[in-house]
Regions:
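Bacterial N-terminal signal peptides
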Residues: 12-22
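Compositionally biased, proline/threonine/alanine/serine-rich low-complexity intrinsically disordered stretches
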Residues: 28-93, 380-476
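Beta-lactamase-like hydrolase cores
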Residues: 69-122, 205, 211
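Active-site beta-strand/loop architecture of penicillin-binding DD-peptidases
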Residues: 236-244, 248-272, 278-285, 309-384, ...
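Active-site SXXK
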Residues: 107-110, 126, 140-165, 181, ...
Length: 476
């Protein structure tokens, strides 16, 4: 018992001693609370810092990009405004002697304060009724963009490369014929045609239609424009749909389409500045172009289709049939829009070419300008409102390819007009390629054109040594 008693006493003393030792430590701890652990994982802190810095960098990059975008937009607006002011100053300097006052007023109002030029002439006689912004129309060369397809189409038809009765594969699942290709300005179609016609033949037809030479108008400072000197490989194809390395004036476009309207006479345009000019009985013809009359006829349905339901529908005139071709692309860093046309179909009295630059070159503004002029001239042209069946639009144009194929169709899809335009309208084995309404309109246009008076047949251009043979047909 004594041993146990001593042991208990010893334990008590030890416990008391420990309590006396711990008490000061606890008091000190209460006076100085433990500091938080500063040893946070270094990697975690580093990741957090990196993430914060990255967020700041991204935010700064977005801010700078937005600032750059706004600055670029401001510069573009300033440049557009300066160009429009410059154009208005040019128009004020136009020599209007020999112009038709009423037609000039209509053309000036149609162009408004936009940066562009307008040519209105008689496709049969060559008389120029008005040129708004004569400096641009006579002296300034523009890339023709898709208006070059008029030359490509004529070359393909005359060289028997195009079979207008057949469709052509322009992608794995899309087929079009000449009428559809012209109406919607299909690049691949005309690239195939140009590649088969060949470079030298393409240039021969371009020169034949008046490109690369002065028109001979009785006005100063006319430019001859430019045609390409040499191209090989796919560059020939691309040139045939985009007009690469061509330079054309608005007056050249007007005389080109006049040649198509009058059946193959390349007339010399003129201002009626003398009494002799006023009473000139016949046109001064530079040459009769050696293109078969059927080739001109076969181009007409696509040109009417362009205006009635295609890329040039902003020129649509509900009282008269207009045949035309659009063009849109980038030339020297700025947008260029073109439209060349004639009307009425059965008795062409007016040819109009419009070219616009900058923002005004987009959205087929030139076609809208021409359309306004045609509509304002209807009474003068003797159009009574009995519209030719050829110019009727589909009843529901919102369902047509024109609203899915955006010259924006293929023309504005990229900076230089697209090389490979894949239409959003594809061939489906269970559905027709085109809507029934548009298909009916195209059929009526073709039937109407077949009833037009035939024109004298001219001998074809002789084949060149590098001429490739073959037809654009459904077997491609």
């Amino acid at each position: 018992m004594k041993v146990i008693h001593k042991l208990n006493r010893t334990v008590s003393l030890v416990a008391l001693s420990l309590a006396m030792l711990i008490a000061p430590l606890q008091a000190a701890a209460n006076r100085h609370p433990a500091k938080p652990d500063r040893r946070k994982p270094i990697e975690k802190r580093r990741q957090s810092n990196n993430s914060t810095r990255a967020d700041r960098r991204r935010a700064e990059a977005r801010r700078r990009a937005e600032a750059a975008r706004l600055a670029a937009a401001a510069r573009e607006r300033a440049a557009e405004e300066a160009m429009r002011e410059q154009v208005q100053a040019m128009i004020a300097k136009d020599d209007i002697s020999g112009e038709d006052p009423e037609i000039r007023r209509i053309a000036v109002n149609a162009l408004g304060d936009h940066a562009g030029t307008v040519v209105v002439m008689n496709p049969k006689t060559g008389r120029v009724y008005s040129i708004v912004n004569q400096q641009w129309a006579l002296s300034e060369g523009f890339k023709p963009c898709s208006t070059i397809k008029l030359v490509t189409g004529l070359a393909g038809l005359n060289e028997r490369v195009i079979d207008p009765s057949n469709t052509t594969a322009i992608s794995d699942s899309n087929r079009v014929d000449l009428t559809h290709a012209l109406a919607y300005s299909k690049n691949e179609y005309f690239q195939q045609v140009g590649g088969q016609v060949g470079f030298s033949k393409m240039i021969s037809y371009a020169r034949l239609m008046g490109l690369g030479e002065k028109t001979g108008i009785n006005a100063r400072n006319e430019s001859a424009g430019r045609v390409p000197i040499s191209k090989t490989g796919f560059a020939v194809n691309h040139m045939s749909s985009h007009g690469d390395d061509f330079k054309v004036t608005a007056l050249q476009l007007a005389t080109l389409v006049s040649t198509m309207a009058n059946g193959g006479k390349l007339v010399t345009p003129f201002f009626a500045r003398t009494a002799q000019d006023e009473t000139r009985p016949t046109a001064k013809v530079r040459r009769i172009v050696n293109i078969d009359s059927d080739s001109f006829q076969q181009m007409i349905p696509g040109m009417i289709g362009s205006v009635s339901y295609g890329s040039g529908k902003r020129a649509f005139d509900p009282q008269a049939t207009v045949a035309g071709k659009t063009g849109t692309c980038i030339d020297h860093g700025t947008w260029v829009g073109l439209f060349t046309s004639y009307a009425p179909l059965n008795d062409p009295q007016i040819a109009i070419a419009v070219i616009a630059r900058g923002a005004d070159g987009r959205n087929h503004f030139p076609a809208a300008v021409a359309g306004r002029i045609y509509r304002d001239l209807n009474s003068r042209l003797g159009v009574s409102g009995n519209i030719d069946i050829a110019s009727k639009r589909p009843a529901n144009p919102a369902t047509s390819v024109a609203d899915t194929d955006t010259d924006t169709d293929e023309e504005e899809a990229d900076a230089g007009e697209v090389v490979n335009d894949t239409s959003s309208t594809k061939v489906n084995s269970n559905k027709p390629v085109w809507g029934d309404q548009r298909k009916t309109a195209e059929s009526k246009i073709k039937r109407t054109v077949m009833t037009l008076p035939s024109r004298p047949t001219q001998p074809a251009i002789n084949n060149s040594p590098n001429q490739r043979t073959g037809r654009v047909s459904g077997r491609q």
